[in-house]
């Protein structure tokens, strides 16, 4: 069983994915102004790779951004690739 927990601190935070209460990966973010959520890192620990945990973290981040009514700046190359390739996620990318 997996769970995703969110931790916020100041102008940033992270989502931590747990498998049987063991940390399996994380995605970090920071706020820029009130309309941009910058996702700057996504990583899944080696022994947990291949289980789609990175995408699960991204989807949790997108859900969070939607709740807050903001767009995402995908500084993390993996997040950018996933969002640009999925037509349903492209509209969540912040554009100037």
PLM region spans:
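Aromatic/hydrophobic pocket-lining residues that form π-stacking "cages" and hydrophobic walls in ligand
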Residues: 61
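C-terminal structural segments of small proteins and small subunits
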Residues: 64-96
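Conserved acetyl-CoA binding element of GNAT-fold acetyltransferases
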Residues: 36-46
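Active-site rim helix/loop that mediates acceptor-substrate recognition in acyltransferases
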Residues: 1-14
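Conserved acetyl-CoA pyrophosphate-binding loop and the N-cap/start of the following alpha-helix
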Residues: 48, 52-57
